[in-house]
Each structure stands twice: as structure tokens, then as C-alpha cells.
């Protein structure tokens, strides 16, 4: 499967690229092709040191969106709306994974505080713009440092929600490829309001306890 990660040069997107490259072709997207190519080269070198010959390329966001079977939006909240409005045609009919969180850093405030999007959540905002795409919300509660630590499994459940059952299953299967992850179907896209709100809490715990990256596990749940 071809996975395009728009904004894949950032920490979260880069970590996902490393974790998903074992079984998929990864297309790292950026506003500048040169920056995307540099990130792709770096990711390939990291994985090659571990004996993995990964298929990773770098493209501008528009071309990456066009190429991907599944497109992951790894974009700061403040740039998400403007970016997806420019890519509506490229994203038409595709599975689009929203991993964004409306952190107050978008307005110069603390990352432990949350903004409240008019649509209810980042994922719902994306779906309301990309009406012909299948938007799935996932990966908000896993820290980039944990994703990039390839020496250890990812000790975190991935909470997934969306309105299209088939698209949601694709994303759940994708998340379950990551060593240590258990992906959980949490229901329709509205649940992203709750899932996104967990992230600033986790960031606060990381700061308070000097953790490299807290995660979340749902206990007493057999799936």
C-alpha cells in the first residue's frame, strides 16, 4: 500500500513513516520537495541500519496526496484547513487520516491547553471540507519520541474513529502493523472530540514527570 504523509518532515509524521515503512511504500510530503527528499533519505538510512530496505520517497504535498492510497495529515492545526482546501481534488475518494490536535500552540499558548474548533474536532473539520473523502481519526495519542524509538515496541493503544466502516478497518489494520500497538474502533467521527482532547493531558504528564512519551491503554477490553 502507498501511504502518503503530508507534513511528514515533522516529528510525528516522520515517526509514523519509520514505523509503517516495513510493509508499505511511504511518500513523505512537504511544502518543499527538497525538504521531503531529505527526510526520505534520512528515514531510509535509519531503517537500512536495521536491515530494512524501505521504499520511501519525498514529494511536494500536492504530488504526495495524488500518489497515496491512504493519506495521513500530519499538519499543525493552524495550517490544516488551508492545506486541505488546496488539495480537495487530489484527496477526492481517498482515505484521509486526521492525526491533528487543536493545541493552543496555534495561538501562541501552551501545548497543555486545547482549542475548540467550530466543527467540534480537527477530524470533523477535515471531513466537512473533504466531503468526497473518507476521513478517519487516529494516532493523536502516541508520542513522536516513542514512534522514533525503534529499539522498543510502541506501548500505546491507537484510538480510531470514523463514519466509513471500510475506511476505518483499513486504518485499524495499518495501525496494527506497528509493533506493540493495539488499534481500537471507537465509533463514529464525533468521538474524535474526546480522543483529540486526551493529547494535551498526555503532554502535561510528560512535562510533569519528565517522561519521554506517555501513551494510553484501555484495560479490561478484549477485541
UniProtKB/Swiss-Prot annotation:
It comes from Methanocaldococcus jannaschii (strain ATCC 43067 / DSM 2661 / JAL-1 / JCM 10045 / NBRC 100440) (Methanococcus jannaschii). It catalyses: reduced coenzyme F420-(gamma-L-Glu)(n) + NADP(+) = oxidized coenzyme F420-(gamma-L-Glu)(n) + NADPH + 2 H(+). Belongs to the F420-dependent NADP reductase family. Its EC number is 1.5.1.40. It comes from the Archaea. NADP(+) binds at residues 9-12, 30-31, 35, 75, 101. This is F420-dependent NADP reductase. GO terms for biological process: copper ion import; NADPH regeneration. NCBIfam families: npdG (TIGR01915).
Amino acid at each position: 500500500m502507498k501511504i502518503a504523509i503530508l507534513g511528514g518532515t515533522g516529528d510525528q509524521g516522520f515517526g509514523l513513516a519509520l514505523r509503517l515503512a516495513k510493509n508499505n511504500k511511504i511518500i513523505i510530503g512537504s511544502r518543499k520537495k527538497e525538504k521531503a527528499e531529505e527526510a526520505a533519505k534520512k528515514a531510509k538510512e535509519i531503517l537500512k541500519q536495521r536491515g530494512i530496505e524501505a521504499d520511501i520517497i519525498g514529494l511536494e504535498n500536492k504530488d504526495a496526496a495524488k500518489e497515496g492510497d491512504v493519506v495521513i495529515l500530519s499538519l499543525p492545526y493552524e495550517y490544516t484547513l488551508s492545506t486541505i482546501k488546496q488539495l480537495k481534488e487530489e484527496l477526492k475518494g481517498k482515505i484521509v487520516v486526521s492525526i491533528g490536535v487543536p493545541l493552543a500552540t496555534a495561538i501562541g499558548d501552551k501545548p497543555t491547553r486545547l482549542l475548540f474548533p467550530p466543527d467540534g474536532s480537527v477530524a470533523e473539520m477535515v471531513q466537512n471540507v473533504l466531503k468526497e473523502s473518507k476521513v478517519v481519526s487516529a494516532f493523536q495519542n502516541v508520542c513522536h519520541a516513542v514512534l522514533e524509538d525503534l529499539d522498543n515496541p510502541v506501548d500505546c493503544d491507537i484510538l480510531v474513529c470514523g463514519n466509513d466502516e471500510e475506511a476505518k478497518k483499513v486504518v485499524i489494520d495499518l495501525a496494527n502493523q506497528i509493533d506493540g500497538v493495539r488499534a481500537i474502533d471507537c465509533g463514529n467521527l464525533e468521538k474524535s472530540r474526546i480522543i483529540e482532547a486526551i493529547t494535551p493531558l498526555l503532554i502535561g504528564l510528560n512535562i510533569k514527570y519528565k517522561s519521554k512519551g506517555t501513551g494510553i491503554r484501555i484495560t479490561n477490553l478484549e477485541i
